[in-house]
Amino acid sequence: MAQVQYAGTGRRKNAVARVRLVPGTGKITVNGREVESYIPHADMRLVINQPFAATQTEGSYDTLVNVNGGGVSGQAGAIRHGIARALLQVDPDFRSALKRAGLLTRDARMVERKKPGLKKARKASQFSKR
């Protein structure tokens, strides 16, 4: 028997998350590990749960996530974006709540590139007038 699944892809900075929602108990698995061991920061786990909180669906779906690229913050944001997109497939009526919370918008901010002649993207060596 085929199991009902809902999929969504989320992106943030250089991280890409492929998310699958399966009706269940609210367990979140990231790259084959429990979310508590994969993302040790409690505030980042709160970020991941924001779409469920916005739609009052905490504990309704098991979440299976494959995420690669980026750091902890970027991966958490990508997972959040993917969960929000997957919840849209569950029920299109969630769109207004997710949109109001700003969870459907792809955060376009990226790291600014380093420029030649500068130490970092904008940091120049100290200027001496005389």
UniProtKB/Swiss-Prot annotation:
Phosphoprotein recorded as keyword: no
InterPro entries to which the protein is assigned, alphabetical: Ribosomal_Su5_D2-typ_SF (IPR020568), Ribosomal_uS9 (IPR000754), Ribosomal_uS9_bac/plastid (IPR023035), Ribosomal_uS9_CS (IPR020574), Ribsml_uS5_D2-typ_fold_subgr (IPR014721)
GO biological process: translation
GO CC annotation, single: cytosolic small ribosomal subunit
Keywords linked to the UniProt accession: Ribonucleoprotein, Ribosomal protein
Alphabetical list of SUPFAM superfamilies matching this protein: Ribosomal protein S5 domain 2-like
Gene that encodes it: rpsI
Protein name: Small ribosomal subunit protein uS9
Region of interest: Disordered: 111-130
Family: Belongs to the universal ribosomal protein uS9 family.
GO molecular function list: RNA binding; structural constituent of ribosome
Phylogenetic classification of the source organism: Bacteria, Bacillati, Bacillota, Bacilli, Lactobacillales
Biased composition (Basic residues): 116-130
Domain of life of the source: Bacteria
